[in-house]
Amino acid sequence: MKCMVIETFKPGKTDEVYARFYEKGRMLPSGLRYVDSWLSSDRTKCFQLMETDKMELLDKWIANWNDLTDFEVVPVEDSPTKAAQQKMD
């Protein structure tokens, strides 16, 4: 399953987010795959596309970062997959 993870950095914590990232990396548990990410132009939000078969791995990863950022996790499907499923229904 793919998920769009929307991170909203807590006020005044942006520099700490990047300091931790440069020091420790993404800190992903095995089985959670980073696909790509985008940063808002004001550097207050990060949009990360992640993939996993076990949603609980997202909770494990979020626990590494939730002192610095708030999270919203939205399960997503790519358009071609959804279109193919609708044709079969």
Language-model features, listed with the residues they occupy:
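Short S/T/G/P-rich N-terminal loop/turn motif that feeds into the first structured element of a domain
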Residues: 1-35, 39-45, 53-57, 77-89
